[in-house]
């Protein structure tokens, strides 16, 4: 097994209070206990979340003391657990190389490279949850100590992601912010009709029952259809309720709205009838 020469002290940037940063050139490097993991920091990124911690310090929701989810006796064994007014080390976008592990650590290999996953959501604080770089010291230091009992979820997932040697350390550390960007902009809307939902059908002209039945068979069947149309319309398998006008229908009352037509005023009115996470479909039939 690969062995590393580990110094007794290190350089670290510590946050000691609101807007109070200190460069500590002799911060002790703690040797790992039985369940602990020591990583050498290869790269760390900083983001606006770190600025909020800088300004709020102990008032930040993730700097609070853990309230449940782990035995307090375990937390007392971890020198990198730094809640409340205890100085912390920021930096949650971190790439590490494991240089030492305790004899009871499983699944984490000395010499291996990892991206640190940040949020320990099974360990709640009063207003949020425990997190690497907040109430546990982060990566703005040369070495960081983690505890497997903290970073392992109730489902058994260890919050260290193996990182390829083909990527630069900074590229690995950027996974976390890019994942936030992707999550913020990813589309999660339904792409089919809501089975068992409420559907509104509005038609300026006629509807082909056969084609519409095939459409429902392919994309999902609502529990009930409300229809506003000049011509009669019925289905064998789904109750159809007729309404005289769109205006008399409740706001945000329908999971799926289908408009057979192209009248701008009608289309604008229909947007107000869509429920949260609902869909609207325009069938123009060649019109504009």
Predicted regions and their residues:
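Glycine-rich phosphate-binding loop and adjacent beta-alpha segment
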Residues: 261-288
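Beta-strand-connecting loops/turns
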Residues: 35, 111, 196, 252, ...
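Glycine-rich beta-strand-centered segment in the early N-terminal region that forms part
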Residues: 28-44, 59-120
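Short, well-ordered coil/turn residues at beta-beta hairpins
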Residues: 43, 117, 202, 258-261
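Residue-level "contact hotspot" at macromolecular interaction interfaces
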Residues: 31, 87, 107, 171-174, ...
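Mid-domain Rossmann-like dinucleotide-binding core that forms the NAD(H)/NADP(H) cofactor-binding site
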Residues: 165-246
């Amino acid at each position: 097994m690969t062995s590393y020469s580990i110094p007794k002290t290190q350089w670290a940037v510590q946050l000691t209070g609101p807007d109070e940063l200190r460069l500590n050139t002799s911060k002790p490097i703690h040797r790992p206990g039985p369940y602990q993991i020591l990583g050498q920091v290869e790269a760390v990124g900083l983001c606006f979340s770190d600025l909020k911690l800088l300004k709020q310090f102990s008032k930040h929701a993730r700097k609070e003391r853990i309230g449940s989810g782990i035995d307090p006796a375990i937390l007392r064994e971890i020198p990198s657990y730094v809640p409340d007014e205890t100085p912390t080390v920021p930096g949650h976008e971190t790439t590490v190389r494991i240089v030492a592990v305790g004899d009871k650590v499983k699944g984490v290999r000395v010499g291996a490279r990892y991206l640190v996953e940040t949020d320990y959501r099974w360990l709640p604080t009063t207003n949020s949850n425990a997190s690497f770089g907040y109430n546990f010291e982060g990566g703005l230091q040369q070495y960081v100590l983690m505890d497997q009992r903290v970073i392992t979820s109730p489902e058994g997932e260890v919050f260290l992601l193996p990182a390829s040697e083909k990527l630069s350390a900074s590229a690995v550390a950027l996974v976390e912010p890019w994942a936030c960007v992707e999550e913020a902009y990813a589309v999660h809307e339904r792409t089919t009709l809501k089975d068992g939902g409420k559907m509104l059908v509005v038609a300026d002209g006629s509807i082909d029952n056969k084609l519409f039945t095939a459409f429902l068979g392919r994309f999902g069947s609502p529990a009930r259809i409300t229809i506003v149309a000049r011509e009669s319309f019925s289905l064998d398998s789904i109750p159809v309720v007729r309404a005289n006008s769109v205006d008399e229908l409740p706001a945000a009352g329908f999971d799926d709205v289908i408009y057979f037509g192209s009248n701008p005023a009608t289309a604008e009115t229909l947007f107000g009838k869509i429920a949260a996470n609902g869909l609207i479909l325009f069938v123009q039939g060649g019109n504009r």
